[in-house]
Structures are given as structure tokens and as C-alpha cells.
A protein has these predicted regions:
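Active-site neighborhoods of divalent-metal-dependent phosphate/nucleic-acid chemistry enzymes
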Residues: 76-129, 133
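Short beta->alpha connector loops at strand-helix junctions that form conserved
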Residues: 145-146
Length: 146
């Protein structure tokens, strides 16, 4: 497993938004599996369902997106990963203490970067500038998603 995408990136991949074309292009060009943790599962599924409440998608569109996620897990595009919770928590606290006051990072963003570090991935995919700054500060490669 060499890449980790934050949930915002994954949401753009599975539900049309301003970043969808860039997310799809990146995945098609890299052909690497993406780590898919319990945090991704909860956050992505909830985000896709929340789009119904916000009237950004229909129930049918959200169901299709959820089914596409399941299909990509089965196809190995999303690779189930289980970083040790204690290790993620320890790394997250370290990142928070070192960077939150400087970068303005949020707890879920910190958890994603900590999870990526614990999993030992090579690169971190995000459209979030603060999360990208944290990932870079933590030593992860964050490609420019143009």
C-alpha cells in the first residue's frame, strides 16, 4: 500500500463536486491501491449520506456512490487497512502538540495524517490546504493535484 487519501479526496472520487475530475485523473494515472481504514469507512459513508440531507444528491445517487465504494474495495482499488489504534492515537497527539497551533489543523485531519504515518504510506492525497501542510510537515509526500 503506497497511497493514502483523506476522506475529502475520496468523496470527490465517488460523488461529483468541484474536485472530481482531478481526483479521478490522479487515481487513473497512479494505479496504486489506496488505504481504506475504519475512519474512511465511517466518514465517507456518512458524507455520501449527508449529501442527501443537504440536497446535493438524491438517495439513488448516494446509493450508487456507496455501491461504487464497495466495488472498489472488492477490486482492490481501496485496500482495507487497520493501523493500530494506540499507535494512531499516540502519533496524532504528537502531531497535534507539534503542529496544531502553527497550522490550525483539525482533529480528524490529524487522525488521517497519523494513520498514514502508522501505515507507512508513500504519499498523501488531499485537496485540503491545511491538511496538506500537516502531511508535508510530518514528512509525507503530498502531490500537487492540478
Amino acid at each position: 500500500m503506497r497511497a493514502y487519501a483523506d476522506t475529502g479526496f475520496l468523496c470527490s472520487l465517488y460523488a461529483s463536486d468541484a474536485h472530481t475530475n482531478r481526483a479521478v485523473a490522479r487515481i487513473e494515472s497512479q494505479r496504486l491501491p489506496l488505504a481504506f481504514t475504519w475512519l474512511h469507512q465511517l466518514e465517507l459513508r456518512n458524507a455520501l449520506r449527508l449529501k442527501i440531507f443537504r440536497r446535493e444528491s438524491t438517495r439513488e445517487q448516494s446509493t450508487a456512490s456507496l455501491n461504487a465504494v464497495l466495488a472498489d474495495v472488492a477490486a482492490g482499488i481501496l485496500m482495507p487497512a487497520a493501523p493500530a489504534p494506540f499507535d494512531v492515537s499516540t502519533e496524532a497527539e504528537r502531531l497535534s502538540a507539534q503542529w496544531s497551533s502553527k497550522l490550525g489543523t483539525r482533529a480528524l485531519d490529524i487522525l488521517h495524517v497519523a494513520g498514514a504515518l502508522v501505515l507507512g504510506v508513500d504519499e498523501f492525497l488531499t485537496f485540503d490546504t491545511r491538511q496538506a501542510a500537516l502531511a508535508r510537515a510530518a514528512g509525507l509526500r503530498v502531490p500537487r493535484l492540478a
